[in-house]
């Protein structure tokens, strides 16, 4: 059972002052997360997606974070692999250097980026990227392991060269793929790497995705393995806000997730710009229910699980917005569905820094110890 946080560097106010404040607040949150027992902080990589994600240089952010921490895992979730965006030689060099400086704390996720806005920034059409991504995905671990690399592929050509340094972890850090659609889960399992399920999947959907991933893993072939370190691992995204005041957590958290979904829809589907209306938790949930279907179906053919009521019954806890007990019940459902790691998403829209800090403290004080004690009992 792993407990982590993933960051987009999302913001409503995109002024220089607020942008700088946002990054420093994220570092403060991540340092607290280490103190409270979280396992890893993951950073996405997106370019030119105003408001939705300003985390465009995760290698710099994660290197800075590594210097501020000693135990916390350092996760790329994920590095975009189009060669003009991130050449495989440079990716291998950066990952290895970060792994050395962090004393072996790196987790390396790979993907392509999800919008034409990003692909077009680097001269690509989104639809042409997958063969390049596949070629780079197989190539990077070889660069990190072999004394010399030479490659003459369809999209990438490298003359024989020694590439340095080599990672701290032997043979290399654990590898993952960004997975929202079923075919990506099948690919991750078949290639013997971890799956980062980055869509807003509820427990039922996580269970079905887990079944797809585990089946592909069980039938994988040695010749399809990416890298030299098989990693069977499924991490599930979990938007959350955990406060002592349940209604406050629901109001702020659901408003944040609504902004997240709307800003995602703006860049992925050309929808309207996101809003930060100050509504009650039930009102936010009702609007989110109306908006979610088209956006999420476009991304991953799934539904966002957002409940409009909390009665305290295990079966009816549909999200992690509420008290520590609410969060425990929902996280238990994700673990029961097959998740190995919870990717908490706190930093959404206008969710204030103070609420995120309280959430990290509450999860570290109540949620993580609950599950760690549970795991210790099961191991006896």
Cite the ranges covered by each PLM segment:
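Conserved, mostly hydrophobic/aromatic
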Residues: 37, 45, 65, 98, ...
């Amino acid at each position: 059972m792993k407990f982590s946080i993933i960051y987009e560097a999302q913001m409503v106010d995109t002024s220089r002052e607020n942008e700088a404040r946002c990054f420093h607040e994220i570092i403060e949150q991540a340092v607290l997360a280490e103190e409270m027992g979280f396992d890893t902080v993951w950073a996405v990589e997106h370019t030119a997606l105003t408001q939705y994600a300003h985390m465009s240089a995760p290698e710099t952010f994660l290197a800075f974070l590594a210097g501020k921490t000693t135990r916390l895992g350092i996760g790329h979730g994920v590095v975009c692999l189009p060669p003009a965006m991130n050449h495989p030689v440079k990716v291998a060099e950066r990952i290895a250097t970060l792994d050395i400086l962090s004393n072996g704390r790196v987790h390396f996720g790979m993907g392509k980026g999800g919008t034409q806005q990003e692909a077009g920034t680097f001269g690509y059409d989104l639809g042409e990227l997958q063969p390049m991504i596949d070629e780079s995905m197989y190539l990077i671990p070889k660069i990190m392991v072999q004394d010399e690399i030479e490659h003459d592929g369809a999209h990438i050509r490298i003359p024989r060269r020694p590439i340095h340094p080599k990672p701290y972890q032997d043979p290399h850090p654990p590898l993952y793929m960004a997975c929202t659609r079923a075919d990506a889960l099948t690919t991750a399992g078949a290639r013997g790497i971890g799956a980062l399920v980055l869509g807003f999947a509820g427990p039922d959907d996580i269970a079905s995705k887990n079944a797809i991933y585990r089946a592909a893993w069980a039938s994988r072939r040695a010749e399809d393995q990416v890298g030299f370190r098989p990693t069977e691992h499924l991490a599930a995204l979990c938007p959350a806000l955990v406060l002592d005041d349940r209604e406050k957590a629901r109001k702020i958290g659901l408003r944040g997730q609504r902004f997240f979904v709307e800003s995602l829809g703006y860049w992925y589907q050309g929808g309207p710009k996101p809003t930060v209306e100050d509504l009650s938790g039930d009102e936010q949930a009702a609007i989110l229910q109306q908006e979610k279907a088209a956006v999420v179906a476009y991304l991953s053919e799934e539904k966002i699980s957002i409940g409009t009521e909390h009665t305290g019954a295990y079966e009816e806890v549909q999200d992690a917005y509420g008290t520590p007990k609410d969060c425990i019940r929902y996280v238990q459902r994700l673990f029961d569905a097959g998740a190995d790691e919870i990717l908490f998403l706190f930093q959404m829209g206008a969710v204030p820094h103070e609420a995120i800090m309280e959430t990290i403290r509450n999860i570290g004080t109540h949620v993580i110890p609950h599950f760690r004690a549970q795991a210790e009992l099961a191991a006896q």
